[in-house]
Amino acid sequence: MVVVGAGPAGLCAALRLNQLGHRVLLVERSRSWPRPQIGEALTPGVRNIIDLLDANNALETVPILAGKPTRLRWTSEAIETVAHDGAVVDRAAFDAALVRLAQARGVAVLRPASLVRVDGRPGSWRVQIATSEGLLQVDATAVLDAQGRQSRREPQRLRAPRLSTLWAEIPASARGPGADRATRVDALPDGWMWGAALPSGRYRIMFTFDPSMRGDAPAREPETLLRRACARSALFEEMAGLPWCNAPSMCASTPYIDALAWQEGRVKLGDAAFALDPISSSGVEKAMRFSLQAVIALNTWCRASNAMEQALARRFYESRLVESAARHFAWSAGYYRQAWCGESPFWRGRSTPTLTSGLAPDDTLAARVADLTLALQAEWAQIAVVRPPSGDSAPRLPMHDLIRLARDAEIVVVPCATGDRVIAHPALQHPNLDRPVAFWDGVALVPLLGALTRAALPVELIGSLGGSMEPASARRLLEWLRSKRIVEPAAFGANACPTS
């Protein structure tokens, strides 16, 4: 396996493929190492991924800053302080530690090196790699592209409205010893600002905006633009005149999804597959989690005994890609709608999920892009109809009232990751679920529903489920089904068999 790119997505894939017994070559183009990065925010879900990769010891010495509050001006012009359960990590040290771990476990690493071309056919690729010592030819079963955002324009990408991000760092000495280290997020009429203390003691400030809406040539005047944004901000005004460690940097930050993320034997990971809006601050976790899903799909594809199993692997990969991207785009749009300055053009243009491509209707890629668009729209429609939890406690389960499976519950077969493979697995589908559910609390769900196809008392159902789970778990399952309206009151003798 050849993995191209040693960011969180590529490193996660290389380590997981190694765990599954594959020989892995990791190719990284950066000449300087550890390389500086701006994606330092780690959301709590990263911990489970690190546990799965058995990488806790390797990351023990990586500088991290956690437990700092967030000062926020978003839904109104009033500033509020909220708890923050994420962390900020030294990304250069984080990536370097995972590279050392991969090498220690037998992953071959080429750096600096770059992918030149790929010839051959799926499952039998001839990969040409440029190194400091010349061209290298490598035979590979599969190629995983984790190179992140590319400067070239990819026509097969569906893009959200354009975004760019400017950033700079303030030295600790400039802010003084008593300066707070809180994260700051501020909505402005023409964009939003984010700031966070780094483990090094520096403070990073970022301004995200739409360059197409500006007439002040931001690419030519980045310092002026960033200082003016600080001056207009209630949370960053005090930083507008402070010295910076270096001149501001600027990068593209437009969210997108790639319609060609899966090709037989060649898959994309992380930002190469889909890029999140930076407002989420969850790019590292999403990149690593999707890499794990992609590895399971690719492992299944490589070890499949027939074309049906390979097709199932692809279906799993693409469904997870669409689900992850659609949920993020929908969440981002909802968050943009909450901004106190939401009537300005910048915010209105991002208040609903909107993706476009630059393809002509007769382009050869148009069909793939159209299929992806329909899949995303279907996912958005499902997200829209599923009601979020109200936050109120659900009524107690009536133990001596008959219940049954709701008539609009269905049993469907979906691609599901079990262990290190993708299999076709029965799952429960219902309008109040945002996706079919195959497992509940680690137990296959559909076999547990058989007793609910006819009217029954919860107290009896808890007893009948005792062979599969503890009584307390059985009760929680019934309460969850009732909270989702997947079970309903039933008259004696009523029947409600789900359809398949």
Task: Label every model-predicted segment.
Residues N18-I38:
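Glycine-rich FAD pyrophosphate-binding loop
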Residues M1-A9:
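Beta1/beta-strand and adjacent pyrophosphate-binding region of the FAD-binding site
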Residues A367-A451, R475, E479, E488-S500:
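Acidic, low-complexity/disordered tracts enriched in E/D and polar residues
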Residues L449-E460:
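Short capping segments at the starts of secondary-structure elements
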Residues R47, D51-A97:
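A conserved beta-strand/loop capping segment in the N-terminal third of enzymes
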Residues L20, L101-A240:
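Predominantly flavin-linked oxidoreductase catalytic cores and closely associated redox partners
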Residues G215-R303, M308-A333, A339-C341:
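FAD/FMN-dependent oxidoreductases across multiple families
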Residues N299-A394:
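C-terminal helical "tail/cap" subdomain of flavin- and related membrane-associated enzymes
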